[in-house]
Amino acid sequence: MKAPPPFYEGDTLDVAKKLLGQKLVHIVDGVKRSGYIVEVEAYKGPDDKAAHSYGGRRTERTEIMFGAPGHAYVYLIYGMYHCFNVITAPVGIPQGVLIRALEPAEGVKEMKLARYGKMELTKTQYKNLTNGPGKLCRALNITLEERGLSLQGDKLYIELVPESQHLSSQYEIVKGPRINIDYAEEAVHYPWRFYFQNNPFISK
């Protein structure tokens, strides 16, 4: 079952925590690639100095953040790595959740080929398959083509995981400062990164 529109509404920190354990799904050439979300970061513009929308900054890139919740915000870092975010909060409030890491679930063969061009991986390579925002986008083939997509469609969406299979039964959810935002002054210290402690696929 897809996460319905109300799932993405409400406080962004709550949505971030709710996303943990759900599946991020991308259908590529008819094949379902998916992973359990094990690490996220919340970004709460316009007051959050780490957010692209800090100060209400509206550009062609950030305009999606001001739109309806439950849409995909994809952008490039270092000109080569894609990052996938889920838009949250009501229209006009530019907030979102960065998906930082996944535990591979379906379409693992295709993910291996997308990341490494081969099927036989070392333990370290497998652990690195989706343990970072750029890595998971490469594995799931999420690019700027998916930017702005509604997560109610049949191509890219969040799939709710039954309680009996949910990773929260195996791992404790913990929080801490976000990663690689040294420029964000006091926002550097906000404990808005949430992850499953000791899950082998978290980014660090």
Curated annotation (Swiss-Prot):
<dbReference type="GO" id="GO:0006284">
    <property type="term" value="P:base-excision repair"/>
</dbReference>
<dbReference type="Pfam" id="PF02245">
    <property type="entry name" value="Pur_DNA_glyco"/>
</dbReference>
<keyword id="KW-0227">DNA damage</keyword>
<dbReference type="GO" id="GO:0003677">
    <property type="term" value="F:DNA binding"/>
</dbReference>
<keyword id="KW-0378">Hydrolase</keyword>
<dbReference type="InterPro" id="IPR036995">
    <property type="entry name" value="MPG_sf"/>
</dbReference>
<dbReference type="InterPro" id="IPR003180">
    <property type="entry name" value="MPG"/>
</dbReference>
<keyword id="KW-0234">DNA repair</keyword>
<comment type="similarity">
    <text>Belongs to the DNA glycosylase MPG family.</text>
</comment>
<protein>
    <recommendedName>
        <fullName>Putative 3-methyladenine DNA glycosylase</fullName>
        <ecNumber>3.2.2.-</ecNumber>
    </recommendedName>
</protein>
<dbReference type="InterPro" id="IPR011034">
    <property type="entry name" value="Formyl_transferase-like_C_sf"/>
</dbReference>
<dbReference type="GO" id="GO:0003905">
    <property type="term" value="F:alkylbase DNA N-glycosylase activity"/>
</dbReference>
